[in-house]
Design a protein with these regions (language model features):
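N-terminal loops that bind phosphate or other acidic moieties
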Residues: 1-354
């Protein structure tokens, strides 16, 4: 995909359908319960109606896509482990043995692991959307070329649209890639104009010394590459990862296809931020599942204007937080589609008092 082709696709993302949102709101108000009594469970279905264009919601087929990629910046000691762990987890994703696979089974959710750019040979059972065998070390120069960033975004768009064509009506996002909290912190710091120290956490449990190395690597990467905060693709290319760029595309693809996309934690939240910076109308497809324990996660969600369903200190990755929210969607849909109405119960409806 070329940048011109990407821009043409983005131009096709339309605003949310406010008539469908209003219809969903009216349906909630007709049900025999206190007005707005289910809080965010109600508004998220209204948002889903605005995205899909219909107050008749069917989200029964769902999938979590786990985008795997390696990051050259791990050479700077920003993580406890090396790139071999990315591959090991990808292999276990293919065998359906990881944490998210167990949670997905409980949530009746399919799992699609995707190689966006892991080091080494392809992993059997992992779908290949590979851009390259990992990114470069961004302390020495750009993590990837601009063309590669566009290609990765394009792969994510194509993936989401294909899943929609296959009948999936809810897409959860996940990722796996050693070093990707470093790339996410770097991208978020530049896009939001925030201090690197504020946007950088301990990832998978770094020591104080490890955290200092991580902050230093990000600062050096920004100094070396001078990314333009007004040019999202420039920031992605210079400081991001193939997983972030691919997830950015998944959010854009969801907006094009009218399919809700669940942001998992910090990393997919940064990807959603990139998507919305590329096309503000794409925000209609972004649904926050939880607020990660990563320090900057809340800042990213606030920038997106999204409130999480769950705040439970999760910071595992793989899409576990997104999948954990799916049963809440199921319960909301059960009430939305099955609860009796005021009219059916012979009860006078509530009326707004304020």
């Amino acid at each position: 995909m070329t940048e011109t082709e990407l821009n043409a696709l983005l131009a096709g993302i339309t605003p949310a359908n406010e008539a469908a949102r209003a219809a969903a709101h009216a349906h909630w108000a007709s049900l025999a319960k206190p007005l707005g009594g289910l809080g965010r469970l109600e508004t998220m279905l209204e948002d889903a109606a605005a995205l899909t264009g219909s107050a008749e919601l069917d989200l029964s087929r769902r999938v979590v896509v786990v985008l795997c990629a390696d990051n050259g910046v791990v050479a700077q000691g920003v993580s406890q482990t090396g790139q071999e762990v990315t591959r090991a987890v990808a292999e276990n994703l293919a065998m359906r043995r990881t944490s998210v696979c167990q949670m997905a089974r409980a949530a009746h959710c399919d799992v699609v692991p995707v190689d966006m750019g892991m080091a080494g040979e392809p992993v059997p059972g992992v779908r290949s959307c590979r851009i390259a065998a990992g990114t470069a070390d961004f302390t020495q120069g750009p993590a990837m070329s601009r063309a590669e960033a566009v290609q990765a975004v394009g792969e994510g768009i194509a993936l989401a649209r294909e899943l929609a064509e296959d009948g999936y009506r809810l897409i959860a996002t996940g990722e796996m890639g050693i070093g990707n909290t470093t790339t996410s912190s770097a991208v978020a710091a530049v896009l939001l104009g925030q201090p690197v120290e504020l946007m950088t956490g301990r990832g998978a449990g770094l020591s104080d010394e490890g955290l200092a190395r991580k902050v230093d690597a990000i600062c050096r990467g920004i100094l070396c590459n001078e990314p333009d905060p007004e040019d999202t693709l420039d920031v992605l290319a210079k400081l991001g990862g193939f997983d972030i760029a691919g997830l950015c595309g998944v959010f854009l693809g969801g907006a094009l296809a009218g399919v809700p996309v669940l942001a998992d934690g910090f990393i997919s939240g940064v990807a959603a931020l990139c998507a919305v910076r590329l096309c503000p109308a794409a925000a209609k497809a972004v649904f926050a599942s939880h607020c990660s324990a990563e320090p900057a996660a809340r800042i990213v969600l606030e920038a997106l204007g999204k409130a999480p369903l769950i705040t439970a200190g999760l910071h595992l990755g793989e899409g576990t937080g997104a999948v954990a929210s799916i049963p809440l969607w199921d319960m909301a849909l059960a009430v939305y589609g099955g609860c009796y109405s005021f009219a059916e119960g012979g009860i006078a409806p509530y009326t707004p008092q304020c």
